[in-house]
Amino acid sequence: MAPSYEHLREADLDEDEFDEDEVDVSDLREKFEVQLEQGFDTFVVIDGLPEVTEEQKPKLVKFLLKKLTSVGKTKEDMIDMPMGPDGKSLRFAFVEYSSPGEAAAAVRQLDRVPLDKKHTLRVNKLMDVDRFGREGRIDDEYQPPHIDEFHPRDHLRSFMADPSGRGRDQFVMFRGDHVGVFWNNEKDTPENIVDRPNWTESFVQWSPLGTYLLSMHMQGVQLWGGPKWDRLGRFPHPFVNMAAFSPQENYLVTWSNRPISIPDEGHPALSMDDDGKNYVIWDIATGKPLRSFANLDLPPDDPNKPPRKHPWPAFKWSSDDKYVARLTQGQSISVYELPRMNLLDKTTIKVEGVQDFEWAPSRPQRDGVKTYEQMFCYWTPEIGSNPAKVGLMSIPSKEVVRSLNLFSVSDVKLHWQSEGAYLCVKVDRHSKSKKSQATTLEIFRVKEKGVPVEVVDTIKDTVINFAWEPKGDRFLIITTVTPTGEVAVQPKTAISFFCPEKSKGSTVGNFKHLRTLDKRNSNAIYWSPKGRFVVVATVHNQNSSDLDFFDLDFEGEKPEGEKDLTANLQLMNTADHYGITDVEWDPSGRFVATWASAWKHTMENGYHMYDFKGEQLREEAVEKFKQLQWRPRPPTLLAKEEQKQIRKNLREYSRVFEQEDAERIAGADQEVVDNRRRILEDWYEWRESVDVEVDEESAAMGVSSNPAEELLKAKTAEILASGQEEEQVIEEIVEEVLEESEEIVS
């Protein structure tokens, strides 16, 4: 029965005995408290200041002002430093900024910043001090903070020590709902290390040095690693879509197409400053967010082109993690310093019309430059009568060290060589009538004095792919003829190889065309991470799935016309993998994995494994196979001299490795033989035990253990007694000549 007033006692209805003060509603008041605008959101409180007298106070204020103005606008008269009754400062100050955003930036960028060797700033919002420091929220008695017991962490680079001693590499596979990490066993079944269902909700990703495995979830991103595959970090970003590491694994960027919405009860990691943002940059070591950003407005769509998407990655890193930059297309490039995430020199780099930029993948060591620098390249289109331009900018000086004017430009792509020694600018040019198009390759020699630019032959066809040799100076392009209209069959492609001429001394010669292989369907280039070997493939194509394995340092005879070039090209092998969508080399450059992903199609999903020569080692069809990714290796710890010594003695090491491989294979074969022999011996023992049991049962029943033998003896005796001859079996063998041939051997 539902309660009603009739069920209440008279005493319960006596209003005189009801006292409102006895009802504690503090929890409800705190939960549903409305934050009224009090006008203090532009103020911050700075603790940790040195104690000064009234005479010393102006000097401290001026010194402090230099740091305060690095994040926003404030003045001396907007800094209030209270003094005690003894005439000395109380070691804190109130600072007013011109906007709430600047106050938030001060908290984010100046908190824990050293003022000098003995003093470190602690910066908080005045509103936060009032909110968290009000009566009842702080205990009168000091309670020491709880410090968790220290537990040593497993070595995060343990994967470098292969327990078999064979130097195998690991890879991760995502199939169905399962994610597993495996040791590569060449022709044999991969050795499973860990396999977990529902480990990720969308995809997995290795960090650049192989330390972490990233998994994606609706609530955010998680990192895993170590020999026990423990969770090493959580980065809560609701509805996250993408994530990317910095090159040295110090930072992580997460992005969601949905703006962050901070609930009234707060968020475990994000603050109200992050509300409405799409990108978050995290410090991996602490798990704390450094700064968040909103999506930039996209330029208006061209009605003749598909809708624009937000660029990814939107934040690009310098090779040493000291800087991260973001492009505002058509306007500027913003460079931020890590870990404070403050804008370099407090200003963006204004570049009118800028379309794209790329950091050098390694620290460039330009000739004659001894100071520290990082470098990025950028390009701008033709604007009015001004030509298109490609520029190289040094950071942190922001000096443009080289620029190049370009004319009749349709599009530009920027391609850095892995060590930052070369930059290839692929320029698509149009004729005056804009009816025909050609491509030129402008190569910047970054490490040479003055950064000279070399123009490679003009290419009449459209270049659809370009790739530098890692740690080398050779490159490939794939070209095709652009069809004038819709065609039923895609036009054929051509593969062109380029390399430098031989030259005296340490200088690299001019780049020359080595060879072109036409009438192909190839559309993708995959260099070995060690250089020399390259796979040219046809991916995402229903009609073709070719794989061509090339060696650019073939040790055989070199064609006469190529003897002055630094390459000897040889096609080692060809293969075919139907439905292929992806190709990836292992970090050692010994093996190549290809796979057909269920994310692209559902036909014959699975993977193939090849060696660097193109010999297929393994093929496995896997239902709902989605992803395979090799685990990267960190750079070697060996000095250059030690590496040279190893290369010098490589033949001796090879003999040892070949002997170990032969013994391992022989051992595996012997193990199979021993196992079969053991099974056969077990069967013989079982049969013998059965015979013994039958004999014992027959003796107990008074029956012969072999009645067939007894019957045969009785029948033979009966035949002999009747005078008949013993039965005999006669076999007749007939041979027939089917074909006869005669061969004369000289």
Curated annotation (Swiss-Prot):
Q: Signal peptide span per the entry?
A: none
Q: Which GO terms describe its biological process?
A: formation of cytoplasmic translation initiation complex
Kindly provide the name given to this protein in its UniProt entry: Eukaryotic translation initiation factor 3 subunit B
Its function, per the record, reads: RNA-binding component of the eukaryotic translation initiation factor 3 (eIF-3) complex, which is involved in protein synthesis of a specialized repertoire of mRNAs and, together with other initiation factors, stimulates binding of mRNA and methionyl-tRNAi to the 40S ribosome. The eIF-3 complex specifically targets and initiates translation of a subset of mRNAs involved in cell proliferation.
Q: Show me the WD repeat boundaries.
A: 195-234, 247-294, 307-346, 349-386, 458-500, 517-560, 575-620
Which branch of life, at top level?
Eukaryota
**Which SUPFAM superfamilies does the UniProt record give?**
DPP6 N-terminal domain-like, RNA-binding domain, RBD
Q: Where in the cell is it found?
A: Cytoplasm
- RRM domain residues are 42-128
Q: Where is the composition biased (Basic and acidic residues)?
A: 1-11
| Chain intervals for the UniProt region annotation (Disordered) | 1-20
Q: Share what the entry says about its subunit structure, partners included.
A: Component of the eukaryotic translation initiation factor 3 (eIF-3) complex.
Which keywords, in A-to-Z order, does the entry hold? Cytoplasm, Initiation factor, Protein biosynthesis, Repeat, RNA-binding, WD repeat
Cross-referenced InterPro entries, in alphabetical order?
EIF3B (IPR011400), eIF3B_RRM (IPR034363), Nucleotide-bd_a/b_plait_sf (IPR012677), RBD_domain_sf (IPR035979), RRM_dom (IPR000504), TIF_beta_prop-like (IPR013979), WD40/YVTN_repeat-like_dom_sf (IPR015943)
Q: Name one GO cellular component term.
A: eukaryotic 48S preinitiation complex
